[in-house]
Every structure is written in C-alpha cells, then in structure tokens.
C-alpha cells in the first residue's frame, strides 16, 4: 500500500491473484513474500487498508509472508530507525524457524534499535494514541489535497504518470532513461528537485505545500516538451 515511488495500492482482487500465483510457485519451491507496509498508516482509507492481509490466510504451507513495518515512517521520525518483521505462515514451526534466523541476524548486524525510538512508539500506541491518530488524520487529509492538485493538473496538461492511488509520492512516466536524465537536469535548473527512478521521475508531494503543488505539473510538462 502507498507504494514508494508510485503511490499505487493493489486491490483485493489483485492480491488474490498474487496469492494464487505464489501458491502455484510453492508447488515447485519454497516461496517468501516480503510485503513492505512502510507507508500504510498514511493510506487514504485507513479503516480498510489492511483488509488485504486476510488473503494471506490462503497461502499454502510452502509459502510464507514477511510483513515489513516501519515505525520511522508511521511516526514521521526518520532519524529514529525502528521497525518490525511480522512473520505469517500456516505452521508455527515455520514461523519459529525464521524467527530464530531473524533474531540472530538482526542482533549481530544492528544490536538493539535506539531506545528513544522504542519509547516513542510505545508512548504513541498507548498513552498518546488518540492524539496521534487525530494529528495523523490531519496530515493524511493534507497529503490527499496535495496529491489531488498534482494529479488533476497532470491529467489536464497531459503529463503522464504511473497509476497513483495514495501516498507520499507520484512518479512521472519517462520510458527513455536517457530522456529522463536530461529532464531531471532541466528540472533542477528551474529549481524543481525530484528523484530519478527507473523509467521515471519521482515527485514527493509529501514535502510540498499545496501552493507549490499548484502549477507544478504544467511547469514540468512544459520543461519535458523542451527536452524532446
């Protein structure tokens, strides 16, 4: 959900297709699905955005899901690195086997996560939960307003972008990476700062004011046209 860099979120039907496909693969080899939910707490439909996880109940015994959760993203505390790997499988034995490996690998690689990050997450999910959810709802609405401005204006001026549903980022579609590089340089010369991704330019609407979102798509389209 809220995919980085496109802002795409898959439907329940798409997840069901993936589960069926992975079960077929599981007939030949063990399969592990890594589901990155770093930005899920900024979904525009927070009440239902986790419903798709129920489809994981249909995984065969040869398929496991690892859900990667980021406290750093959920709490917008990027400097306090903290997260979790949630293991889901049909047998307790399979979960425990992977849990042991994760425990040893994580401990050997990073030791413990910062105490401040753990303390902050505990505080926000208990004592300060209601205040956190209220504040976050305000930011989700602000994010939706910004993304609506950019995508609606992109549609109006013909600036192509990858399918977007929700989240921090919108990615402009540039199939030719050589053109993308020229476009990226031209944007910077006009003080428009984006991130290059494969066959695209990522726009972080999360870091732009609504005012700066207005007219941005049109400016980018005009600059792109001069690069062709």
Q: Which stretches of residues belong to each language-model region?
A:
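Active-site phosphate-binding strand-loop segment of PLP-dependent enzymes
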Residues: 1-48
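Well-ordered, non-membrane alpha-helical segments in soluble/globular domains
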Residues: 12-21, 47-56, 144-148, 217-218
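PLP-dependent enzyme catalytic core of the Aspartate aminotransferase-like
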Residues: 19, 177-228
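Short helix-capping segments at alpha-helix termini
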Residues: 25-28, 58-61, 157
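Structural preference for beta-strand elements that scaffold enzyme active sites
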Residues: 30-32, 66, 169, 200-202
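Conserved core segment of the aminotransferase class I/II
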Residues: 57-140
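Short hydrophobic/aromatic beta-strand micro-patches
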Residues: 86, 171-173, 204-206
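Conserved glycine-rich beta-strand-loop-beta hairpin in the small C-terminal domain of fold type I
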Residues: 122, 135-155, 160-173, 196-199
